[in-house]
UniProtKB/Swiss-Prot annotation:
Signal peptide: 1-20
Pfam family, any one: FlgI
Quaternary structure note: The basal body constitutes a major portion of the flagellar organelle and consists of four rings (L,P,S, and M) mounted on a central rod.
Function of the molecule: Assembles around the rod to form the L-ring and probably protects the motor/basal body from shearing forces during rotation.
Name this polypeptide is given: Flagellar P-ring protein
Origin superkingdom: Bacteria
Organism: Vibrio atlanticus (strain LGP32)
Family, per entry: Belongs to the FlgI family.
GO molecular function: structural molecule activity
Localization: Periplasm; Bacterial flagellum basal body
Annotated HAMAP family: FlgI
Length: 363
């Protein structure tokens, strides 16, 4: 049987943080982000692996007209060394004119391969329709494609996508709100009210009272210098402040394809019993009373005492010590050689019955 993999996180978001984290590792400055660019262009110089489509021919004719070449009316160039492509790039924050960025080139027609091609000058536009970069250069394609006369074909990786390292030159800068206003806002990568408040407290302890405040579960506003020249040093100091983020919420993440199970520290099970096929999983909870000695000053308290049993049709039984967690359940199911699908069904049934204290996420 395929074994189930259990992963207990002690340092990630599903469990408590064992070490302090820097602000720059858990939050981003609002407005300081990369921007996606896209353009439409032509790749030429292909060794017979191009295409002949209406939009490719139209683009090819428009390119010739830009160079002053006018084809006779009704002429349809049958070129197999040209391909229409979409060019994409990501423009980092604070990119300046003249800097270069990588581009990805993808065929949108029936071209067999872009290997050996050259991208002609292509304008890359942002969401607002303005041109922010211009791309051109020779493609690097890791894939390959070969076809025999009898129709047999061999393809490795993806020959219709290539990259051009430093293939686009930035022509226009994208403005950011970095230098505007009296405040700088930090947005948490993972929203959490407690983490937001702790971040604000850490900044106030470093800068002084009332310098930072949590707006909501995601954003923390920090009063910043008005002089732009001072904000770089200010942010450099702020983003390296260390603090203790809040413990993550109780979650169970199950990858049904690999059988991997990620269990948060705070996940607990209530009393329940599940029968799945020939396997039975039983959870029992007893409430014991702890009585202090006379005149000791102690208090009478109720102490939960939990046990779990897993049995199969052949009579196998597994017993566990009190103090039940989902870790015990997973190990018990693993002992009887259950497939990942068995545990998926058990976890879903327990969640539907309200026996799991936490979120169940199946990916």
């Amino acid at each position: 049987m395929k074994k189930l993999t259990l992963v207990l996180f002690g340092m990630l978001f599903l469990a408590s943080s064992a070490h302090a984290a820097r602000i720059k590792d858990v939050a981003k400055v609002a407005g300081v982000r990369s921007n996606q660019l896209v353009g439409y262009g032509l790749v030429t110089g292909l060794p017979g692996t191009g295409e002949t489509t209406p939009f490719t021919d139209q683009t090819f004719n428009a390119m010739l007209q830009n160079f002053g070449i006018q084809l006779p009316p009704g002429t349809k160039p049958k070129t197999k060394n040209v391909a229409a492509v979409i060019v994409t790039a990501e423009l980092p924050a604070f990119s300046k004119q003249g800097q270069e960025v990588d581009v990805t080139v993808s065929s949108i027609g029936s071209a067999k391969s872009l290997r050996g091609g050259t991208l002609l000058q292509t304008f890359l536009k942002g969401l607002d329709g303005q041109v922010y970069a211009v791309a051109q250069g020779n493609l690097v394609v890791s894939g390959f494609s070969a076809q025999g006369n009898d129709g047999s074909k061999l393809v490795g990786n993806n020959p219709n996508v290539g990259i051009i390292s430093s293939g686009a030159t930035v022509e226009q800068e994208i403005p950011t709100p970095f230098g505007r206003g009296d405040y700088i806002t930090f947005n948490l990568i993972q929203s959490d009210f407690t983490t937001a408040q702790r971040l604000a407290d850490a900044v106030n302890n470093f800068l002084g009272p009332q310098m930072a405040s949590a707006v909501d579960a995601t954003s923390v506003k920090v009063r910043a210098p008005r002089e732009i020249s001072q904000r770089v040093a200010f942010l450099s100091a702020i983003e390296n402040i260390e603090f203790d983020p809040a413990e993550g919420s109780a979650k169970i993440i199950v990858n049904s394809r690999t059988g991997t199970i990620v269990v948060g520290k705070h996940v607990r099970l209530k009393a329940a019993a599940v029968t799945h096929g020939g396997m039975t999983v039983a959870i029992k909870e007893n409430l014991n009373v702890s009585q202090p000695n006379a005149f000791s000053g102690g208090q009478t308290v109720v102490v939960p005492d939990s046990d779990i049993e897993v049995t199969e049709a052949d009579g196998k039984m597994f017993k566990f010590e009190p103090g039940l967690t989902l870790d015990d359940l997973v190990r018990a199911v693993n002992e009887v050689g259950a497939a990942p699908s068995d545990l998926m069904a058990i976890l879903q049934a327990l969640k539907q019955a309200g026996a799991i204290e936490g979120q169940l996420i199946i990916i």
